Amino acid sequence: MPKYYCDYCDTYLTHDSPSVRKTHCTGRKHKDNVKFYYQKWMEEQAQHLIDATTAAYKAGKIAPNPFTAGPPKPNISIPPPTMNMPPRPGMIPGMPAGAPPLLMGPNGPLPPPMMGMRPPPMMVPTMGMPPMGLGMRPPVMSAAPPQLNPKS
């Protein structure tokens, strides 16, 4: 009668019956051995990836990290913004470059408030609350409501 060999535990089981294998595979030592086996396998894979990356870098197949190059050279400068450039999102054409973008409404940016008027309140519904204007819906009743003063 052939015996069952467990690769994780490096041992032979007494019988090759499904019940013996099931009992063995649900045991604490077997589960620990399986966990250790895969931890070791993952460490080997990670080390292999590190070695392959290092070898490729040394062979010149991987460019050095561009973020470790340091600050840009002083003779290269970014041109200042001009009025000929298109406006940023949320900006009205012709606004100065340092001005903050306008508040966004459902149909685009809100117009600036008129002199002497307060800005509109920012009403944002909270989680689980219906949007403004909908309010609470009355419950749906399948029967007529009970009468409070029945006539006797």
From Swiss-Prot:
ZnF segments: Matrin-type: 4-36
Keywords: Metal-binding, Nucleus, Ribonucleoprotein, RNA-binding, Zinc, Zinc-finger
GO molecular function: mRNA binding; pre-mRNA 5'-splice site binding; U1 snRNA binding; zinc ion binding
A Pfam family annotated for this UniProt entry: zf-U1
Domain of life per record: Eukaryota
UniProt keyword Zinc present: yes
Subunit relationships: U1 snRNP is composed of the 7 core Sm proteins B/B', D1, D2, D3, E, F and G that assemble in a heptameric protein ring on the Sm site of the small nuclear RNA to form the core snRNP, and at least 3 U1 snRNP-specific proteins U1-70K, U1-A and U1-C. U1-C interacts with U1 snRNA and the 5' splice-site region of the pre-mRNA.
HAMAP family reported in the protein's UniProt record: U1_C (MF_03153)
Known function: Component of the spliceosomal U1 snRNP, which is essential for recognition of the pre-mRNA 5' splice-site and the subsequent assembly of the spliceosome. U1-C is directly involved in initial 5' splice-site recognition for both constitutive and regulated alternative splicing. The interaction with the 5' splice-site seems to precede base-pairing between the pre-mRNA and the U1 snRNA. Stimulates commitment or early (E) complex formation by stabilizing the base pairing of the 5' end of the U1 snRNA and the 5' splice-site region.
Protein name: U1 small nuclear ribonucleoprotein C
Organism phylogeny: Eukaryota, Metazoa, Ecdysozoa, Arthropoda, Hexapoda
